[in-house]
């Protein structure tokens, strides 16, 4: 993901609202040899000015085992996206692009015994 300052949302409330609206996210981690990922609906909660995500991951799967060994995760929330053709620009030498909205949240995963 390209991180240009003019595309970065600094308003924490807007970022949280985005995460809540597009809460079907991808949790990524690293297994024995390869990255692992799981798509999961998440609940977003704020406690003492910290963001907590909660959801359900089935036990004894490759991603559950990977997350037990390495608690560091990246959670990706994807929103609207669309192709932008170079022909839409008036200037020359402009390449086509893809506009999108996303949040990448880094943190640590923990499990309850429920």
Predicted regions and their residues:
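Binding-site signature for planar aromatic cofactors or substrates
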Residues: 1-114
